[in-house]
């Protein structure tokens, strides 16, 4: 049972029976929680339009099993204005949290990172920095502690101009070869600071987070990523034609 109304966002919703919904929500104090919203799809339900992703909510629930029962719901404000690539980016963030975060593990810091990422997506002209910062925050919240600033082999500080090879769960060691597993020192420093000043640094951060998140996703593709590809590829082809 929740202790009063909780700040939440809907990560995913799916219909259940004729009039109900099953919700995966991300709450500030309880982490990821699964709720049964009885009658939420009914014609007379005042919750019909409120239980949507990207809408800040206050929710209260009861129950001790893996699926709780929603008892009260109030929207805090209107949903965040997301469309196009920014909407797909936000859907990707939701799917990541739903897929990799353990249920009912309090993550108030990550909740704030999530809210900040959605706000950034609603206001920015480039979704990539917000996505990379959130992926790194998610990895940190799961205890994925990689030292980007020191060589795993020697403990020496990373040099901006040197090349380093990533070793899963261990860190980075100096390397003379360049491939998909290697990064320049300045890229590692940018990832550590979550501050990206060049396209190359953003691309390096994307490579790293994909490598680091891969074990948590279990080889199952992300639906949001595939949906984005299906939507954008036909548009790109028509532009070329």
UniProtKB/Swiss-Prot annotation:
Give the record's family classification: Belongs to the RecO family.
Gene Ontology CC annotations of this record: bacterial nucleoid
UniProt name for this protein:
DNA repair protein RecO
- InterPro entries xref list: ARFGAP/RecO, DNA_rep/recomb_RecO_N, NA-bd_OB-fold, RecO, RecO_C
Per the record, the gene is recO
Q: Which PANTHER family match?
A: DNA REPAIR PROTEIN RECO
- Role description: Involved in DNA repair and RecF pathway recombination.
**UniProt keyword terms in alphabetical order:** DNA damage, DNA recombination, DNA repair
**One of this protein's Pfam families, by short name?**
RecO_N
**GO BP terms in the entry:** DNA recombination; double-strand break repair
NCBIfam families noted in UniProt: reco
